[in-house]
């Protein structure tokens, strides 16, 4: 009976979050087919036309990944169309700063929904890049993966 309670305690207090870590990927090309099922024989559901768009992987089967996007569209994409480059979409308008501080020089206003490539992140800020400009945004209200780099 003691073993049973011990097992229950282990299951309750074990770090289950390891199994539930979100996997974000980005679209590799400007045109990516999303299918109804995990096969090239499966019909095309819709087509993305945005390189680097961040999407969340929710399942996998062989060489296909089931994904969901910011607008809750879902389907299957072949791995050849995906990459692990980190990208983000702001869920609200953001100010791009020269340094990771609100007291730094503002460089630009980033509109909600714009795809940004992530260079690096710390606990509160991400250094991001567009086609024309690079700077820092705060990490609140973003869709995508923010790889936290902790200071030693």
Predicted regions and their residues:
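Acidic, glycine-rich flexible loop segments
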Residues: 111-112
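Boundary regions of SH3-family modules and the immediately adjacent low-complexity/disordered segments
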Residues: 21-29, 38-50, 54-62, 68-105, ...
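Positively charged n-region of N-terminal signal peptides that target proteins for export
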Residues: 1-5
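Soluble catalytic regions of membrane-associated enzymes that act on cell-envelope
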Residues: 9-10
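N-terminal signal peptide c-region/cleavage motif recognized by signal peptidases
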Residues: 13-15
């Amino acid at each position: 009976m003691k073993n049973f309670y011990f097992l229950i305690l282990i299951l309750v207090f074990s770090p289950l979050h390891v199994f539930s870590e979100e996997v974000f990927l980005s679209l590799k090309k400007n045109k990516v087919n999303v299918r109804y099922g995990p096969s090239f024989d499966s019909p095309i559901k819709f087509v993305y036309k945005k390189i680097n768009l961040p999407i969340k992987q929710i399942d996998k089967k062989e060489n296909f990944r089931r994904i969901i996007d910011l607008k809750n569209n879902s389907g299957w994409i072949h791995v050849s169309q995906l990459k692990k480059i980190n990208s983000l979409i702001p869920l609200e308008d953001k100010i791009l700063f020269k340094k990771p501080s609100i007291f730094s020089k503002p460089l630009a206003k980033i509109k909600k929904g714009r795809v940004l490539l992530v260079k690096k992140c710390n606990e509160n800020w991400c250094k991001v890049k567009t086609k024309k400009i690079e700077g820092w945004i705060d990490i609140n209200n973003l869709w995508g993966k923010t790889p936290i780099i902790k200071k030693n």
